[in-house]
Amino acid sequence: MDGYQAPSDQEVKVERIIHRACERVVILNTLDFLYGHVLLKLYNAQHYIDKHPDLGLVIVLPRMFQWLVPQGVAEVWLVDQRLGEAHGWYAAIDRFVQQQLPNYKEVYVGRGYAHPEFADIDIERFTGVRPFPMEEFLQRPPHVTFVARQDRLWFATPAAKFLYRVLNKFGLKKSLGRWYVHAQDRLIRRSMDRISARLPGVRFTVVGLGDKGGFGTDVDDLRTQRMDKATELAWCAAYAQSQVVVGVHGSNMLLPTAHAAGCIEVLPYDRYGNIVQDVSVRYSDRMQLFLYRFVDEFASPSTIARHTISMFKDFAVYHRDNRENIF
């Protein structure tokens, strides 16, 4: 409401892309200042495409998400605006919308629920990448992908996290914070070593915004400082080849969990109230309890490895008891 009461006169370009002309439409507004919120709202598109075929779906979307527009959409209104600027009310966007409304005979406003039922969502319709098929969990070579964020790190101890926050408070994160990024890399490397010792032939991938290096030639390091569609698709392909993805809680886990068979998430204490909100849960039965695991924010590499190994070693019996031997 604050933004509405104090609208911005900043010019914002909006591009209208018409895939299918419709006289009756429902408009799904996905604009938000947080990446995860936009993606979660976009997931609702499948509902309107499938449940309301008599209405053309119009999606209002930040341009950086254009690669995720699913087939079946009538129109896309691409907004050239940084996510961080999507707090307020922009007269330019409102003006564009008002200009388009007379083009239709009927217009409905779609509800963009923040947490739709993930198990019903077909992520391939959004990314074009087929997710890991559970029935091939043990047939495919073991593959684990680590999601390594540099803005939300995995810390070894409470003291390490406290000192990192001190650096941030005094403006030293850019100069001295690299040590903590390298410390996270060491935690990931130690996790890989422990997993490899029990799962011969396991393959590893690392993704995330960051600089490559430090893991050796046996790890497929897909980290980069610049994002584009090719990188997004390469990351999704890595998730879809993975039985397990590992990462710290955050919106960075939405697409990995939508494509991989399962995950291990490092959950900070101050995010307990948001548990599972960043996980695209693919299953509606007990398999979700087995395949989606949450560990302490200061979990050791041994803990990560122990859960990963269990997911492979115990999968056959758990799947048989909870998926096969039931009515």
Q: Over which residues does each language-model region extend?
A:
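A short, glycine/small-residue-rich beta-strand->loop->alpha-helix junction that serves as a flexible
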Residues: 30-41, 152-157, 181-183
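Short, glycine/acidic-rich beta->alpha junctions
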Residues: 37-41, 187, 227-231, 245-250
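Secretory-pathway glycan-assembly enzymes, especially type II membrane glycosyltransferases
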Residues: 1-143
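Short loop/turn segments at strand-loop or loop-helix junctions that form parts
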Residues: 23-29, 141-171, 207-209
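Leloir-type glycosyltransferase catalytic cores
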Residues: 110-132, 275-327
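Short, charged/polar "capping" segments at the starts of alpha-helices
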Residues: 63-70, 211-217, 271-277
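A donor-sugar binding/catalytic signature common to diverse glycosyltransferases
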Residues: 235-278
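Catalytic donor nucleotide-activated moiety binding site of glycosyltransferases and closely related
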Residues: 62-63, 148-152, 169-232
